Amino acid sequence: MSEVEIENAATIEGNTAADAPVTDAAVEKKPAAKGRKTKNVKEVKEKKTVAAAPKKRTVSSHPTYEEMIKDAIVTLKERTGSSQYAIQKFIEEKRKELPPTFRKLLLLNLKRLVASGKLVKVKASFKLPSASAKASSPKAAAEKSAPAKKKPATVAVTKAKRKVAAASKAKKTIAVKPKTAAAKKVTAKAKAKPVPRATAAATKRKAVDAKPKAKARPAKAAKTAKVTSPAKKAVAATKKVATVATKKKTPVKKVVKPKTVKSPAKRASSRVKK
């Protein structure tokens, strides 16, 4: 072999020796990287399965709320029903293993039972429905559902009745108008009649005014009384003033029969004679 061939062979062996450890290191590193990824993926999957695990449903040691409420109402035996507080107290004394939200749940169940018709609410108390009410409730529901189907016929009948009623009202109004005219004539006649009453009242007033003038003539007797008794003068004067005041106060509109009043002069003369 020549020297050139020997040198080429040596360089090839050196290159292969240098390349061998690099490839081994690369091969060793790659599996390590793959192993880390698989570990992370497994950990995430395990966490997800733990979180997604369904919670076990806790079985309550007490019966349903409906049964407990009915039992409380039956045992309490109140005539007007049992209040929420009484039912709550009874259940708490009888059942010791109750949840912390028992009172809220009791109120919700009471409302639900009242809405469904299993309980009857009277003011602030609850009681069981009577047997007659239970029997009548299905019948009432059936009756309500039956007329609901026959609504179109009833609507047509009501429309026809409304038209007939409107026509009859129009006829009545036409017939009533002549009556109103006749009534107006009658009222006008009635208003014209009371005129003679006013004339009669005027004549009575004139007669009343004329009578006192005729009675005021005997003034001579008053003069004789003045001479005999000076103390009686003041009494007669006061009486005259009183009679004048009463005459002024009498209203003109009222027609009053004249009273037979003696004049003060005559009274004085009668007292002197006594």
Swiss-Prot record:
InterPro entries referenced in this protein's UniProt entry, alphabetically: H1/H5 (IPR005819), Histone_H1/H5_H15 (IPR005818), WH-like_DNA-bd_sf (IPR036388), WH_DNA-bd_sf (IPR036390)
GO MF, one annotated term: structural constituent of chromatin
GO biological process, one term: nucleosome assembly
Family statement drawn from the similarity comment of this UniProt entry: Belongs to the histone H1/H5 family.
Protein name as it appears in the record: Histone H1.1
Cross-link Glycyl lysine isopeptide (Lys-Gly) (interchain with G-Cter in ubiquitin), sequence positions: K161
KW Acetylation (keyword) present: yes
Function: Histones H1 are necessary for the condensation of nucleosome chains into higher-order structures.
Subcellular compartments: Nucleus; Chromosome
Segments of skewed composition (Low complexity): 16-25, 129-145, 175-185, 221-233
Presence of keyword Mitochondrion: no
Cross-referenced Gene3D superfamilies: Winged helix-like DNA-binding domain superfamily/Winged helix DNA-binding domain (1.10.10.10)
Basic and acidic residues composition-biased segments: 40-49
Coiled-coil region: none
SUPFAM superfamilies hit by this protein: Winged helix' DNA-binding domain
Region annotation Disordered: where it falls in the sequence: 1-63, 129-155, 167-233, 249-274
Chain positions with N-acetylserine modification: S2
PROSITE patterns reported in the protein's UniProt record: H15
Gene source species: Arabidopsis thaliana (Mouse-ear cress)
Keywords from the UniProt entry: Acetylation, Chromosome, DNA-binding, Isopeptide bond, Nucleus, Ubl conjugation
Domain H15 intervals: 61-130
Gene Ontology, cellular component aspect: nucleosome; nucleus
Highest taxon above the source species: Eukaryota
